[in-house]
């Protein structure tokens, strides 16, 4: 389970609740609509048994229609609930990737300021910080690599340093937020607009579950 899977689980629960409620009420409304069409209320001479069935069919139809319309009117609120999940997710990402003085590695900082590091050594320092998920040091190493890249003695060294700098720029959690926006929030809105996608939610969400 990924670091931010809690928010995917919350989104899944909201989608399941929303799509199930909509699907069930729509199905019941359509069934009541068919029953009403089969036994319409008639004026004039009809049997008591038919009159009772027709009246019940009409009442069932009106009740099912009202429930269905209520569910449809409530869909914008579901969007608001997804927006709240996203807000919590963004806050969690910001906290996870925030610079933390407690994570400063003074020995590595001294090396970065010494001027003796070769491009490959920047790369090794970055790999070590990434392994430790030390985002404070990742960003510091990246910033220093970007600062010295243009001074590299070779084009190969410059390319290595720029690659290290790029890895640090991606260590702010932005990729996670973009993945949630596209793979969760936007997908949910598309499903709300197009109920035929409801049954595909699990399949379409799987890549995001794996990523987060």
Question: What kind of region is each of these model predictions?
Answer:
Residues 18, 25, 46, 57, ...:
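A general marker of short, structured functional hotspots
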Residues 2-16, 51-151:
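Long, charge-patterned amphipathic interaction tracts in eukaryotic proteins
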Residues 147-212:
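C-terminal modules of long, charged coiled-coil scaffolds in eukaryotic assembly complexes
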Residues 1-36:
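Charged, compositionally biased N-terminal leader segments and the immediate start
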